[in-house]
């Protein structure tokens, strides 16, 4: 990318251990505090409940960036709606409301290295090597 930019990583988790439903957001490390006046693009793997992206968006918006956009690889279709509504500017794929693994998405630390994104099997422990 031929543009000057600063890339920051923030780790927020909401699925501890073997949980397959969100347990609330936990921030590990910290949120950059020098984003006032900057153009910010949040890139996330998956939009599910909306809680983690909602939290991050509020924390960054409080710093008054020049612009704030959100991109997600996957957005789960929620028939009943999300816990928190988050406007997303860019979506790679819309998926059904199922727990998915692979290509960086994990289940208790496993399956992150799979080359594809697939639905978590009903009894995932039997697939662990």
What are these regions (language model features)?
Residues 1-129:
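PRPP-associated nucleotide enzymes
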């Amino acid at each position: 990318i031929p543009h000057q930019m600063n890339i920051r990583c923030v780790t927020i988790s909401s699925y501890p251990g073997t949980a397959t439903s969100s347990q609330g957001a936990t921030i590990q490390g910290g949120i950059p505090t020098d984003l006032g006046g900057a153009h910010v693009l949040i890139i996330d793997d998956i939009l599910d409940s909306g809680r983690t992206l909602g939290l991050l968006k509020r924390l960054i918006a409080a710093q008054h960036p020049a612009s704030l956009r959100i991109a997600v690889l996957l957005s789960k279709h929620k028939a009943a709606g999300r816990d928190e509504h988050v406007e997303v500017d860019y979506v790679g794929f819309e998926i059904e409301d199922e727990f998915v693994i692979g290509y960086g998405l994990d289940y208790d630390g496993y399956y992150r290295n799979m080359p594809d994104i697939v639905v978590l099997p009903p009894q995932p422990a039997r697939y662990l090597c």
